Amino acid sequence: MLPFATIPATERNSAAQHQDPSPMSQPFDLPALASSLADKSPQDILKAAFEHFGDELWISFSGAEDVVLVDMAWKLNRNVKVFSLDTGRLHPETYRFIDQVREHYGIAIDVLSPDPRLLEPLVKEKGLFSFYRDGHGECCGIRKIEPLKRKLAGVRAWATGQRRDQSPGTRSQVAVLEIDGAFSTPEKPLYKFNPLSSMTSEEVWGYIRMLELPYNSLHERGYISIGCEPCTRPVLPNQHEREGRWWWEEATHKECGLHAGNLISKA
């Protein structure tokens, strides 16, 4: 089982008080660092990320189980920077949960929104549910990928809550550290940390319950993988969590594009 022991309060306070808030961006050997972190705890991976990037590291929060990532990062750096995507189609419970997390940790969450100049023509021409007919790619491209691309254009490193057990078809090879193949450019590499990659759903929920973290109330109604309201449904017993997303499409295509590298690497 992956170690994710709780950091004692005295150590958490010390880490928070001594965290250097200035950007560090220290050069490093990517393969060597990735290899050294491969078997480390999520906290150790995040600590290394902060050591190399300081406040240039952004945490991605989806409004679901990745509250664990926010919690771990906040305990290492109280000045942690967090962003979340508001597609305009999230569940009411998710909006409430994002507010809960903001208040619980006393942090600002940078909420990213779609560009209305792109969104309005799509809705006007195809309506609000074109993804059931045309696939989710176009809608996700406007509501998720474009806002994220705008955000990451000014970011040197980010951390996600991706886990290998979330999708055997697309996430089974998620590395703890990689160059983001979807959003890097030749001039500007983007470093992507996945500290929770080796954690299982059971371990994530053990952490949430042990520390009594806030969580999305949709989880109490059978939702596991939570996205936009029209594209998410509860899963049945013995179904994989990803079967609750875009259920009308092939399993191998169940990535919205935020982690397109998972698909690119399999091409």
Swiss-Prot record:
UniProt note: pH dependence: Optimum pH is 8.5.
Binding of adenosine 5'-phosphosulfate, residues: 60, 85, 144, 161, 242-245
Source domain of life: Bacteria
GO biological process, alphabetically ordered: cysteine biosynthetic process; hydrogen sulfide biosynthetic process; sulfate assimilation; sulfate assimilation, phosphoadenylyl sulfate reduction by phosphoadenylyl-sulfate reductase (thioredoxin)
Annotated keywords: Cytoplasm, Disulfide bond, Iron, Iron-sulfur, Metal-binding, Oxidoreductase
Cellular localisation: Cytoplasm
Biased composition (Polar residues): 11-25
Disruption phenotype annotation: Cysteine auxotrophy.
Cofactor binding summary note: Binds 1 [4Fe-4S] cluster per subunit. The cluster is required for activity and may play a role in binding and activating the substrate for thiol-mediated reduction.
A Pfam family hit: PAPS_reduct
Cofactor: [4Fe-4S] cluster
Pathway(s) where this gene product acts: Sulfur metabolism; hydrogen sulfide biosynthesis; sulfite from sulfate
Region (Disordered): 1-25
GO molecular function annotation: 4 iron, 4 sulfur cluster binding; adenylyl-sulfate reductase (thioredoxin) activity; metal ion binding; phosphoadenylyl-sulfate reductase (thioredoxin) activity
CDD domains linked: PAPS_reductase
Role description: Catalyzes the formation of sulfite from adenosine 5'-phosphosulfate (APS) using thioredoxin as an electron donor.
Assembly description: Homotetramer.
PANTHER family: 5'-ADENYLYLSULFATE REDUCTASE 1, CHLOROPLASTIC (PTHR46482:SF9), 5'-ADENYLYLSULFATE REDUCTASE 3, CHLOROPLASTIC (PTHR46482)
Protein name: Adenosine 5'-phosphosulfate reductase
